A protein has these predicted regions:
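Acyltransferase
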Residues: 3-84
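A generic structural signal for short, non-catalytic loop/turn and secondary-structure boundary residues
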Residues: 1-2, 117
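Glycine-rich, charge-dense phosphate/pyrophosphate-binding loop(s)
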Residues: 47-137
């Protein structure tokens, strides 16, 4: 949907895929796996339709985020600053350490300053929406 704004937050450290996978439990209850699948579908529908309510439900991740957020000491503060300032959502991108914010407006300059003052160095990049989709180069 054309209304979405995407902001990535790139800290000055990496989280290896091995470390990010190693922190996850060996298995999950079926109910958690089913809930996560439903949330992913809500996220996709919310993004396609511009529906903030659906992306808020869709961001609920019980498979990865509760564990991987512990590898990112800044995550809770960043999430609070981003979501308060933009009324959007913040997610861990892949295994981390990059996070992505999805909202209908970009961060204010005041919020950007607060974020750059968090633990470590965090680069903030506002990304344009790509309407072309996936392609082979």
């Amino acid at each position: 949907h054309l209304d979405w704004k995407f902001t990535v937050f790139i800290p000055d450290f990496e989280v290896s895929t091995e470390k990010a996978r190693g922190i996850l439990p060996q298995g999950y209850p079926r109910s958690e796996a089913a809930a996560n699948t439903a949330h992913a579908i809500m996220m996709l529908k919310g993004l396609a339709d511009g529906n903030e309510r659906l992306i808020r439900h869709g961001k609920k991740d019980c498979i990865h985020e509760p564990y991987r957020r512990t590898l990112l000491p800044f995550f809770d503060s960043l999430q609070n600053l981003f979501e308060t300032d933009t009324d959007g959502i913040l997610l861990i991108s892949g295994s981390g350490s990059t996070c992505i914010g999805i909202s209908k407006k970009y961060l204010s300059e005041q919020a950007k300053q607060k974020i750059t003052g968090l633990e470590g160095s965090i680069s903030i990049r506002e990304l344009p929406l790509c309407l072309k989709g996936a392609s082979v180069l």
